[in-house]
Amino acid sequence: MWGSGELLVAWFLVLAADGTTEHVYRPSRRVCTVGISGGSISETFVQRVYQPYLTTCDGHRACSTYRTIYRTAYRRSPGVTPARPRYACCPGWKRTSGLPGACGAAICQPPCGNGGSCIRPGHCRCPVGWQGDTCQTDVDECSTGEASCPQRCVNTVGSYWCQGWEGQSPSADGTRCLSKEGPSPVAPNPTAGVDSMAREEVYRLQARVDVLEQKLQLVLAPLHSLASRSTEHGLQDPGSLLAHSFQQLDRIDSLSEQVSFLEEHLGSCSCKKDL
């Protein structure tokens, strides 16, 4: 006697031998009806056949004669076999290997690339580092912020790696920077030299203010006498000269404000503590 497991295996073997790769055997999930099959009935009958053969006649002569034999033959009956539906996997699905009659494998056209898997018709599940309808596009982890590099991030096809400072080496997976033997290098200070540059700018503006003040004294000294003499000698109104003097005053005032602003912020500069 066979056990239940052996009977089940035998039943699957019968189904696999009897069916085709296109059709399944009963309606179920992702299985569609593709047509109705039917046709004439084939039946057997006894057919009479006359078979010639040689024999000897009187006088030892060879004679030919016939004998009747009967054999089983097949013929089409006028009747029609009962119609029955035919089933196949619905569009976008195909037979699952090892499971007769099951349509559990999705179809993606074009197929998924770079290690992606087809999870439903026309939709791929992409591995880490790839994106797109068929997993054809590399993900730039450096620009999207997915990478966690503390220093420089370098994108590669399907992944990325971190480039460390001098004296550091990348980790096994390339996503971190590890210090080599010895003291860790100090990262460059981007604010180095800012204090000295600000001081030089203050000195330069102060020198310009001094020059403009000297010019202003030269202009204002003869201003009153110039106005009186111009009236006595019938000269034109010296308003243009006065307007020029006021412009010089405005320039001096503007430069003084710039010097004050730099001096005020120079004291609060964080990099000053490193000097």
Swiss-Prot record:
Q: List, alphabetically, the GO terms of the cellular component aspect.
A: collagen-containing extracellular matrix; extracellular region; extracellular space
One matching Pfam family: EMI
Name all EGF-like domain ranges. Answer: 104-136, 138-178
Leader peptide range in chain numbering = 1-21
Looking up Gene3D superfamilies in the UniProt record yields: Laminin
| Short sequence motif named Cell attachment site, residue ranges | 131-133
Tell me the ranges covered by the EMI domain, including all copies.
28-105
GO MF assignments:
calcium ion binding; Notch binding
Q: Name one GO biological process term.
A: vasculogenesis
Compartments, as annotated in UniProt: Secreted, Extracellular space
UniProt entry keywords in alphabetical sequence: Angiogenesis, Calcium, Cell adhesion, Coiled coil, Developmental protein, Differentiation, Disulfide bond, EGF-like domain, Repeat, Secreted, Signal
InterPro entries documented for this protein: Dev_Signal_Modulators (IPR050969), EGF-like_Ca-bd_dom (IPR001881), EGF-like_dom (IPR000742), EGF_Ca-bd_CS (IPR018097), EMI_domain (IPR011489), NOTCH1_EGF-like (IPR049883)
**Span list, region Disordered:** 173-193
- Oligomeric form and interacting partners: Interacts with ITGAV/ITGB3 in an RGD-dependent manner, increasing endothelial cell's motility.
UniProt function note: Regulates vascular tubulogenesis in vivo. Inhibits platelet-derived growth factor (PDGF)-BB-induced smooth muscle cell migration and promotes endothelial cell adhesion to the extracellular matrix and angiogenesis.
The molecule here is called Epidermal growth factor-like protein 7
Organism, by scientific name, is Mus musculus (Mouse)
